[in-house]
Amino acid sequence: MIPGSTSGISFSRILSRQTSHQDATQHTDAQQAEIQQAAEDSSPGAEVQKFVQSTDEMSAALAQFRNRRDYEKKSSNLSNSFERVLEDEALPKAKQILKLISVHGGALEDFLRQARSLFPDPSDLVLVLRELLRRKDLEEIVRKKLESLLKHVEEQTDPKTLKAGINCALKARLFGKTLSLKPGLLRASYRQFIQSESHEVEIYSDWIASYGYQRRLVVLDFIEGSLLTDIDANDASCSRLEFGQLLRRLTQLKMLRSADLLFVSTLLSYSFTKAFNAEESSWLLLMLSLLQQPHEVDSLLADIIGLNALLLSHKEHASFLQIFYQVCKAIPSSLFYEEYWQEELLMALRSMTDIAYKHEMAEQRRTIEKLS
């Protein structure tokens, strides 16, 4: 409803009542004319004419709707194809390829070299060539060159690398914007993930080294989203068996992320731990190192705590080791390189705690002796 329309209607009705005595005769004549017109409009010929007219209007509307829908569909397909191309200035560069290939003559190797200089990543190049081949106005000779070029690129590229790069591209673009990173870097990380044979701790550590510890949680979200998208793709990069193994690895990585958050947040919730070292990255590094080298716990702790330990009492040392023992015990044993390593780590920590406790008792005795 338009604001003020109610008052406008009321005002019109008031005016109508004020002038009704002047228009009585005209109203009667008009009413008779309307009755006559209605009679003519209700005749069979008029009804047929109105039906034909309404049918023509409906047909025109439907045709306009179909044309708009087809146009939007084509525009959407074009947009979607180039959205998955992560190279900057994809559309102008694609037109440049078309211009180069439209010039008659030249060897396929020359076209391939120039195309790769514009789109170094094979997934980008394949997407661009496929999109160009969808054009209906191509000369036959140009179409054949594009087909040969596409076939050559596909044959020379590892299928898993090619398909994974295509299937994760939209996720890479989305997360790249979120993380203020080049999407091509994220695409490379997904490719590495599906082909890596490294332990999950090494993969997680590599992400931290590449993106910074602040981004580690979101990077794992990207890998998970890309993997699920890849699984659902029409042309998936891996077999069902391979995807099953990757999903198990993803579960381990998510478990590692949860353990990481619990480990770091618990330790930093204690003031005496912050007194040792208040940096989240330091405790994260310690946990990842313990999963790989639990036998080095003594030296690893010394690296993290450093000279700050000299400023604290034996009681604070013992309290810290008790808390540290509990957070290490909470780490799932499956995250260690060898599951039995966790028990060996806990044994070492119990021994260190016993020593700290003995020092604490000795310190208390000395204090009592001084007071007495």
From Swiss-Prot:
Gene3D superfamilies: 1.10.150.630, 1.20.1280.240
Region of interest (Disordered), residue spans: 1-46
Biased composition (Polar residues): 1-19
Entry's Gene Ontology cellular component terms: cell surface; outer membrane; plasma membrane
Subcellular location: Cell membrane
InterPro entries per UniProt: HrpJ-like (IPR010812), Invas_InvE (IPR003520), T3SS_LcrE (IPR013401)
Transmembrane intervals: none
Its membrane topology: Peripheral membrane protein
Keywords: Cell membrane, Membrane, Virulence
GO BP annotations listed: negative regulation of protein secretion; protein secretion by the type III secretion system
Keyword Cell membrane assigned: yes
Main location: membrane
UniProt feature, compositional bias: Low complexity: 21-40
Function: Involved in the triggering of intracellular events that lead to microbial internalization. These events include increase in calcium level, redistribution of actin microfilaments, and changes in the normal structure of the microvilli. Encoded within the type III secretion system (SPI-1 T3SS), it is essential for the translocation of protein effectors into host cells. Forms a complex with SipB and SipC in the presence of their chaperone SicA. Positively regulates the secretion of SPI-1 T3SS effector proteins SipB, SipC and SipD and negatively influences the secretion of SipA, SopA and SptP.
Protein name per the record: Invasion protein InvE
The species this protein was found in: Salmonella typhimurium (strain LT2 / SGSC1412 / ATCC 700720)
